[in-house]
């Protein structure tokens, strides 16, 4: 570059070394400013109210709603065993052994932590007879795995046979409390390496549950009114709702809004992620392939805890009142009682971002179309018999609760309820400032990368993403700062 500058007639022939150094310094500074101007401020510190109970729950008597919250909080962190002790029933297949190992950032009930607890399971006694899948890393996201399609007997992918069920990472093989189910031959892990090679594998990360009770208590009619208001938007966005198959009501939890309620969300997770049968999912769950072939789980791996089925149920003779509940009810009450995250300041490169910058970023976020899906406040809750903080309360979730086509770039080719292979629920953005892993599969920790991923063939968000790309670097940074303030 120096020789080019010295010989370039635009610089008057030979340029002296001092002038050349100045030019190079200026170029470096310009590049540094350009890089700085579009940088994710990163995960923000502090709690921002996450992990706390709703005000009316905290203010209740120790024997009232506060007791249910505290009981659920404790059970959410219980470590499950296969057999023996009060908290048995784990497995025979599982992804983790406690709710809080997946829902931990920045507090119990949140999203996946910075250090992945799954990575230690083969060495710390949780899953000693297992092989650690290559995609599980120490500082990567906590995940569940699905194969979008079934495999043929010859090992090829059958594109005409949709699968999409969870393939649990670990088995109880090798554990001292696994009883008769203690052979890798009897209970092998899924073929993760083959699925990776065939590109027939997708990942999901945990969704945070802060403020979930408010989302649950949004009336269907409120959501439908919001949808109607957006029918004539200028951004090519046309979302829909996933519905509960039994009563046709709007479902709203999970990456594809596949779960109607927090109770169903809890029951499914207990069964799928930890292998614990309950009043909603009453049997130990085989892998999708075992279910398809009709083989089911080996008899030697059934009822390992000795409780019979379901393994989790109510205890009418329990005392105090909260202890009467089954774990699934305790989990759902805990999540229903969690306060939503509060917006906060943003620190970037050691400097406090101004409130004006954050406000400007919020206005830009709306003007370019982001708020069409990420609705700042989709409505007020209806009356609640659970606790007064859930009644007539605003829900600043930054979501319309609708499912949208996100294109082939984000598609996971898994259908759940009315949500197709490239459809996902608009992820609520409250608490984004403290979220580490982004998008449904945790593929990135960088907001810029996540925003760019919204544009691909078939995505409803492509126009909005293009609007973002057309902003100046300063304006893009203002939006990033705003997002990390949530």
Positions of predicted regions on the chain:
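Bacterial N-terminal signal peptides that target proteins for export
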Residues: 6, 13-24
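Short hotspots in intrinsically disordered terminal tails
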Residues: 11-12, 483
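Residue-identity detector for glycine
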Residues: 12-13, 409
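Periplasmic c-type cytochrome electron-transfer domains
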Residues: 35-486
